[in-house]
Amino acid sequence: MATKRTFQPSNLKRKRDHGFRARMKTADGRKILSRRRAKGRKVLSA
């Protein structure tokens, strides 16, 4: 039996799990965004 690939892309899940609004919902998510801003990331979230 062959094992399936683990990455099954879905834009909906991508945004829901890693999007800007998902990050803003939690305190830790906001920490992630502030770290990425401090680092100078062009893209903050998915």
UniProtKB/Swiss-Prot annotation:
It comes from the Bacteria. Belongs to the bacterial ribosomal protein bL34 family. Residues 1-46 are annotated as: Disordered. PANTHER family: LARGE RIBOSOMAL SUBUNIT PROTEIN BL34M (PTHR14503:SF4), MITOCHONDRIAL RIBOSOMAL PROTEIN 34 FAMILY MEMBER (PTHR14503). The keyword Endoplasmic reticulum does not apply. InterPro entries: Ribosomal_bL34, Ribosomal_bL34_CS. PROSITE patterns: RIBOSOMAL_L34. One of its GO terms (molecular function) is structural constituent of ribosome. Residues 1-11 have a biased composition (Polar residues). One of its GO terms (biological process) is translation. It comes from Stenotrophomonas maltophilia (strain R551-3). This is Large ribosomal subunit protein bL34. Keywords: Ribonucleoprotein, Ribosomal protein. Coiled coil: none annotated. The lineage of its organism: Bacteria, Pseudomonadati, Pseudomonadota, Gammaproteobacteria, Lysobacterales. Pfam families: Ribosomal_L34. Residues 12-24, 32-46 have a biased composition (Basic residues). Gene3D superfamilies: 1.10.287.3980. HAMAP family: Ribosomal_bL34. GO terms for cellular component: ribonucleoprotein complex; ribosome.
